[in-house]
Curated annotation (Swiss-Prot):
Catalytic activity: L-seryl-[protein] + ATP = O-phospho-L-seryl-[protein] + ADP + H(+); L-threonyl-[protein] + ATP = O-phospho-L-threonyl-[protein] + ADP + H(+); L-tyrosyl-[protein] + ATP = O-phospho-L-tyrosyl-[protein] + ADP + H(+)
Cited Pfam families: Pkinase
Source organism of this protein record: Homo sapiens (Human)
Known outcome of mutating residue 219 to V: Increases interaction with KSR1 and BRAF
Expression by tissue: Widely expressed, with extremely low levels in brain.
Modification after translation: Phosphorylation at Ser-218 and Ser-222 by MAP kinase kinase kinases (BRAF or MEKK1) positively regulates kinase activity. Also phosphorylated at Thr-292 by MAPK1/ERK2 and at Ser-298 by PAK. MAPK1/ERK2 phosphorylation of Thr-292 occurs in response to cellular adhesion and leads to inhibition of Ser-298 phosphorylation by PAK. Autophosphorylated at Ser-218 and Ser-222, autophosphosphorylation is promoted by NEK10 following UV irradiation. (Microbial infection) Acetylation by Yersinia YopJ prevents phosphorylation and activation, thus blocking the MAPK signaling pathway.
PROSITE patterns listed in its UniProt record: PROTEIN_KINASE_ATP, PROTEIN_KINASE_DOM, PROTEIN_KINASE_ST
Protein name from the UniProt record: Dual specificity mitogen-activated protein kinase kinase 1
Subunit structure: Found in a complex with at least BRAF, HRAS, MAP2K1, MAPK3/ERK1 and RGS14. Forms a heterodimer with MAP2K2/MEK2. Forms heterodimers with KSR2 which further dimerize to form tetramers. Interacts with KSR1 or KSR2 and BRAF; the interaction with KSR1 or KSR2 mediates KSR1-BRAF or KSR2-BRAF dimerization. Interacts with ARBB2, LAMTOR3 and RAF1. Interacts with MAPK1/ERK2. Interacts with MORG1. Interacts with PPARG. Interacts with isoform 1 of VRK2. Interacts with SGK1. Interacts with BIRC6/bruce. Interacts with KAT7; the interaction promotes KAT7 phosphorylation.
Length: 393
């Protein structure tokens, strides 16, 4: 079906003509923003939602520590803690990430400056940004609050995430990565379930991407947990590109489909426990990994093998065959899609354009899936009065 010409985006200047977070000439900025948004292929619903977000954002003005009231903690990770907060002057609920850094003022100012690029990241597949500021030894990054949380939290409640749902997730992640690359020349650098956020309107958005080189450098020591999603070429310290993000997406999809981090791969016994039936395929043929001498036997999900030490895990990613989905429980298209994401040589790995036209994505795009309904029933959220079908996907 041919795409109809998008209606122009309507953004109303803030009543007092005040600038967004300290930028001048609000009206000129709005015109430039309208032009950028019209270049995106948005459907009517996505257009209206982006308009509403940007119109609300204009009322926010400059962000200050005193203007926030803590509601609850949403999670911790990547060197920071995220709180659900109320921005008292505007009445908006936001997510506020606090990153404690012992750094010189010049570095701090550079980080805040680099984070300003986020004001220009406006897409249905990217978490909205209200602003960043520094106070009391902490950098604050204020974002749109996504009431469904992150997919790692959803996975804990769901046990496993169904293939149809993961189809919609895959589309959103590919479109989000494509937007960052094409419009901003940015790589994500940290794709994993905890950086894919969802909400009760059925939206699926990426957060925590590497927009500030200085922030990445300043937080280098806190990235240990993330290494388990890094591509082999990145772990080996060689040149890496957006192809590295595709590996991370593939690994995340296998994790969400089977219900646990997929390295080492589950053996036949564990797969039978997971899926309640005998499962065919290579994943079921993995020989049990010998237990490290002197290490106690501990439970690892349904797997009786002990968890790997980080160095064993990274060695496995670089030197062993990549994970794959067990056959017999997932469609051939989904299995092939994941296999193309998890090719160890980045030059042979599928790129974003190839993935966008893959049979699994085409099928998922055509499927009517009530993502919002599934999410709300899975995590016990109230659904908005106008349910949506995998909004914007």
């Amino acid at each position: 079906m041919p795409k109809k010409k998008p209606t122009p985006i309507q953004l109303n200047p803030a009543p007092d003509g005040s600038a967004v977070n300290g930028t001048s000439s609000a009206e000129t900025n709005l015109e430039a923003l309208q032009k950028k948004l019209e270049e995106l292929e948005l459907d009517e619903q996505q257009r209206k939602r982006l308009e509403a977000f940007l119109t609300q954002k204009q009322k926010v003005g400059e962000l200050k520590d005193d203007d926030f009231e803590k509601i609850s903690e949403l999670g911790a990770g990547n060197g920071g803690v995220v709180f659900k907060v109320s921005h008292k002057p505007s009445g908006l609920v936001m997510a506020r990430k606090l990153i404690h850094l012992e750094i010189k003022p010049a570095i701090r100012n550079q980080i805040i400056r680099e984070l300003q690029v986020l004001h220009e990241c406006n897409s249905p597949y990217i978490v909205g940004f209200y602003g960043a500021f520094y106070s009391d030894g902490e950098i604050s990054i204020c974002m749109e609050h996504m009431d469904g949380g992150s997919l790692d939290q959803v996975l804990k409640k769901a046990g496993r995430i169904p293939e149809q749902i993961l189809g919609k997730v895959s589309i959103a992640v590919i479109k989000g990565l494509t937007y960052l690359r094409e419009k901003h020349k940015i790589m994500h650098r940290d794709v994993k379930p905890s950086n894919i956020l969802v909400n009760s309107r059925g939206e699926i958005k990426l957060c925590d991407f590497g927009v500030s080189g200085q922030l990445i450098d300043s937080m280098a020591n806190s990235f240990v947990g993330t290494r388990s999603y890094m591509s082999p070429e990145r772990l080996q310290g060689t040149h890496y590109s957006v192809q590295s993000d595709i590996w991370s997406m593939g690994l995340s999809l296998v994790e969400m489909a089977v219900g646990r981090y997929p390295i080492p791969p589950p053996d036949a016994k564990e797969l039978e426990l997971m899926f309640g039936c005998q499962v065919e395929g290579d994943a079921a043929e993995t020989p049990p990994r010998p237990r490290t001498p002197g290490r106690p036997l501990s439970s690892y999900g349904m797997d009786s093998r002990p968890p790997m030490a980080i160095f064993e895990l990274l060695d496995y990613i670089v030197n062993e065959p990549p994970p794959k989905l067990p056959s017999g429980v997932f469609s051939l298209e989904f299995q092939d899609f994941v296999n193309k994401c998890l090719i160890k040589n980045p030059a042979e790995r599928a790129d974003l354009k190839q993935l966008m036209v893959h049979a699994f994505i085409k099928r998922s795009d055509a499927e009517e899936v009530d993502f919002a309904g599934w999410l709300c029933s899975t995590i016990g959220l109230n659904q908005p009065s106008t349910p949506t079908h995998a909004a914007g996907v």
